[in-house]
Amino acid sequence: MQENLKNDKLKIGKYEFDSRFILGSGKYSLELIKSAIEEAKAQIITLALRRANTGEIANILDYIPKNITLLPNTSGARNADEALRIARLSRELGCGELIKIEVISDSRYLLPDNYETIKACELLAKEGFTPLPYMHADLYAARAMRDAGAAAIMPLAAPIGSNKGLCAKEFIQILLNEIDLPIIVDAGIGSPSQACEAMQMGVSAVMVNTAIAEAKDIALMARAFSLAVNAGRVAFLAGVASVSEAKASSPLTGFLRD
């Protein structure tokens, strides 16, 4: 069993990772990012391009260890063309070809635009990027993103920053059943228990930002999420018991009654 766990890798395109916990960085102070990464034992961290501006005095890239894989996002893009421009700038800054596609034109609810995201997947894949689209958990859109070149699908669990948990659980389960790509739950996860629940479903990884950034002790909460993600993954591999009616866990006959 230990050997199976050792060989249990998160595979995204040509990349492999031991950790299935992806850390967001959009709400941390720069000074806290390194300690959060260390406690999370994360190997991937997302970042917005605006925080990696090499012309600024404070550059987030200076606070991220060199052995951590960067997952820049296209935050701020309102359509596919804008997402492509941001991705190109990210690559010029040396952030690599992995890219999380975020296309959001709705400023009130901050919901991803699945239609423009599909277009962005195709554009970025043609230019050699490894796109990971952030999207609504919609089967038809997920199929289109897969066909357009997505390396993984990142459905939201609940509205971004809401900490409401697995509101889209049933729809995420459909993606797990039907899409042969890594499914990475992104947005809305508010507690370690919710992250564990997502991993028990069989998702490939969980990405968390707000729930850690708003904790009283950021580093300790990052550790809690890391443990929860690992526990959920091990539980999934072990085979979580199905829900049923009351059933005795010990024999009721053959002792006092005989």
Swiss-Prot record:
It catalyses: [ThiS sulfur-carrier protein]-C-terminal-Gly-aminoethanethioate + 2-iminoacetate + 1-deoxy-D-xylulose 5-phosphate = [ThiS sulfur-carrier protein]-C-terminal Gly-Gly + 2-[(2R,5Z)-2-carboxy-4-methylthiazol-5(2H)-ylidene]ethyl phosphate + 2 H2O + H(+). 1-deoxy-D-xylulose 5-phosphate binds at G161, A187, G188, N209, T210. Transmembrane segments: none annotated. Pathway: Cofactor biosynthesis; thiamine diphosphate biosynthesis. One of its GO terms (cellular component) is cytoplasm. GO terms for biological process: thiamine diphosphate biosynthetic process. GO terms for molecular function: thiazole synthase activity. It is found in: Cytoplasm. The active site is at K100. Coiled coil: none annotated. Belongs to the ThiG family. Catalyzes the rearrangement of 1-deoxy-D-xylulose 5-phosphate (DXP) to produce the thiazole phosphate moiety of thiamine. Sulfur is provided by the thiocarboxylate moiety of the carrier protein ThiS. In vitro, sulfur can be provided by H(2)S. Homotetramer. Forms heterodimers with either ThiH or ThiS. This is Thiazole synthase. It comes from Campylobacter jejuni subsp. jejuni serotype O:2 (strain ATCC 700819 / NCTC 11168). The gene is thiG.
